[in-house]
């Protein structure tokens, strides 16, 4: 029970702290592409920017509500990995830039490994599936 409560706090913390970054990206996608995507040489900067923004938005919402939790964590891990790469390429191993990114990465990785816990919609769906003998859900 304490593990599930800890996972709930972790999911809510990561989701609520990270979701605004995605919304900020969508507010000025061109500026984000120019400042963050083009310097590291990713192809199709505008499309890559939209992918990053919506990965953060939808990944955060999935973590917050506990639906397809591992898929949401994987989306966040992908975006944060690119952000870590950007921070290292542009500023070197500056711990002040990397520490928050590494915390997001570590938290999302824990959710990816352990799932959403007892207080997630995923758990309710799993119990429903077992009760009615349904096939497996993706990302369990």
Regions found by a protein language model. Give the residues of each.
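Membrane-interface interhelical connector segments
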Residues: 26-44
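Extended, low-polarity transmembrane helix blocks
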Residues: 1-27, 46-54, 58, 65-140
